[in-house]
Structure formats: structure tokens, C-alpha cells
């Protein structure tokens, strides 16, 4: 029995050490774009290589677990090489016919590692080939079909603006609702007198039919609550900025 558990522990340690030593990271890995519009939906994501070695991945589109939209999705490049301490761009495009049923459509992206052999010198001076073990993540993603006026379905209520007691700047809290049939990810911009821009904060993904989700935004550039006059919610459909909602802060 002890040998059995010892083998499991050793295996887990090996896997954990392989994952932590191979610095694979995905940024902006959310889609949430409309796929049945005239131009379809487009989003750029990033593979970040924090290691000191070159990495290469084959990217595949797989069926989603729920309403499958994988047949509408293309990804470029299909094989990507990322140099050490750099990042590579993954372009995701989805185009569905205008006749499809409205709602969310799911798909997955698989990042399968391609081993890049390297040469290493052993203690005896011999040159041998080596290869790193890499993780192969599969990411769930989704888009949607149908017209949504996010300006009317996104609500931000019970707003409070306070000093940040744990640091500089201010904290804005409130309850966020998304009354639409699709998830959305977006950010918030803070403005002061005469539309002076203080900075932005990323809100993240808000699922469909979300009710009164507690949101906390930090703006370190604002000295006191009375300096905040306006918050703008925005998103980036097909990498273009679109204002969702403008909220005046009355203090």
C-alpha cells in the first residue's frame, strides 16, 4: 500500500515540477464575440513564454460541451513558435450564418505542445538530445448569435466611492447585472473634472443573466472620492472599443 501511494506522490511531484518549470501562460483568453454579424467575431489572444527556452504549440479548435459552435471558428496560426521571454499572437475568428438560432455557442481551443529537441552536454563531454515535457491545456470559450444592446442590459447600482484604506487612491463598489442571453467581458474607465482621464480597471467576464454581482474597482491615481465624476464601461468587440454605459457619479 505504501509503495502504491509513494508512486502516486512521486508522479504528482513530477507533474507539478514540470508545469512550474515550464512557464506557459495565456493572456486575454476570452472570446465573447458576436459570430453571426456581417463581419463575424474576432479576438486576439496571447501565448506568453516566460521561460528561457523556445516553445512551439499546435492550436486546434474542438467541439464545445454545450451548444457547439466549433464549426464556425478558425484560428491562426495553427502552429505557433514563441521565443524565450516573449509572446505570440493567436488570432481567433468566428463567422456563422445569420439564420442560426440566437444564444451562446461554445467551443474549445487546445494548445498541444510540439517538442523542440535541444542539445545538452553531459559531464563526460558527450552531446545528447533533450526535450522538455510540456502541458497541453484545453480552454473553454464561447461566442453568441443575435442582437444585444448591452447599453440597456448592463446595470450598475448601489454605487459607493470610498478611500482605499489599504493603499493610495479610491475604491468603487457596486452591484452589476447582465440581463442578456450572452456573457460579456469589459472594463471601466474613471474620469474627473473636465473629463480628465484617471485610468482604467478590468472588470472581467460577467455571465449571462447575472444578477447583482458585487464589483470592486480600484483607481490608485485618484486622490479622494470627490475627484471622481464619471465611470465609463467599455468593451472591445473585434478589438474595437465600444462604450457600453456612462455613469455619472453624484457626490
Positions of predicted regions on the chain:
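Surface-exposed binding patches on compact interaction domains or structured appendages
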Residues: 25-28, 46-93
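Terminal connector regions
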Residues: 97-148, 225-251
